[in-house]
Amino acid sequence: MYSLDWPRAYGIPNSTATFKLFPEDFQVNELFEGQFSGEGEHIVLKIEKRGLTTEEVVKSLARLINKPIKLISYAGLKDKQALTTQWLSVHAPGEIIDGIETLEAPGWRILECTRHNKKLKPGFLSGNHFIITLRNVSDESDLVHRIEQIKFKGVPNYFGEQRFGRDGGNLIKAEEILVQGRKVKDRFLKGMYFSAARSWLYNLILSRRVKESSWNLPLLGDVIQLVGSNSIFVNDKSMDEQLLQRIGDKDVSPASPLPGRSKNLVKGTALQIINDVYEEWSAWLDGLEKNGLEEAWRANILYAEQIEYRINQGTVELSFVLPAGAYATVVLRELVQY
């Protein structure tokens, strides 16, 4: 019912590769723009984990320091089948937890320890740095050609399959709540299911644009978003040359909606594409609006910055930086079949 094989911007890659043969083949490191204050109510820990989810590390840490899980916060979730570093914060006002800076357990360890005057939460991250190893690459020249393409043109900014749960399970739960009226008391789970539903509808809209080769073009009535910002404006011209240049300069991007109560910003051709999807999924849209979700916007174009690669006898190591909320797998799927 929920196919997650979205259309690609550059066609199906010629090259195949093996991905995630080992956790070290997918390395992720969180990036922050600012610095921690060095003082405050929150102990901030830089964690290295391997083969564990963020939630599993949080539970393990909570047991070791004898604290409720609710006192531990983070800025983002990191993959299980990976080697990742991320920051966790522990609310411990005026408290010293002996030995916390050297704690470790199977699958994780603490690399750094400091304090901060705010707890970590989504929005703190500026981005993530990825180091990815692809093994048994069958067509290195095709891979390199595609890397050069996406350096300048970017890729469709789909939500990755992780967003939807195993086998789309989060979408099944969302359907039960939004259409069948099932009650879910756990606010975290409910929010996760709603996020999956909105992401699904966003991907459907973006996939229509990819099929029509308009995902990176400013249609009449499009909402345009400044890259790296939530600032938006509406394009009231058809194929504005100045706007095309700004897209080429990675300054702005056409955007698609994360559904909710609408401010009716989008118009014209862009609105028709959105309405076609909303008409098909009207029950979901009604449910999201009834649950108080507000419409938001997400750029259509994802730019992978600081791309570097090394090739060694069929193995390719890729390194790049993505903004917070973006998925490395949507970059990889434009490069190789894995």
Curated annotation (Swiss-Prot):
Active-site feature positions: 79
Gene that produces this protein: truD
Keyword terms: Isomerase, tRNA processing
EC numbers on record: 5.4.99.27
Protein name: tRNA pseudouridine synthase D
Molecular-function annotations in GO: RNA binding; tRNA pseudouridine(13) synthase activity
Signal peptide location: none
Annotated function: Responsible for synthesis of pseudouridine from uracil-13 in transfer RNAs.
GO biological process: tRNA pseudouridine synthesis
Gene3D superfamilies in the cross-refs: TruD, catalytic domain, TruD, insertion domain
Residue ranges constituting the TRUD domain according to the UniProt record: 154-303
GO cellular component: cytosol
Family of the protein in this entry: Belongs to the pseudouridine synthase TruD family.
Catalytic activity: uridine(13) in tRNA = pseudouridine(13) in tRNA
PANTHER family referenced in this protein's UniProt entry, alphabetically: TRNA PSEUDOURIDINE SYNTHASE D (PTHR47811:SF1)
Annotated SUPFAM superfamilies: Pseudouridine synthase (SSF55120)
A Pfam family reported for this protein in Swiss-Prot or TrEMBL: TruD
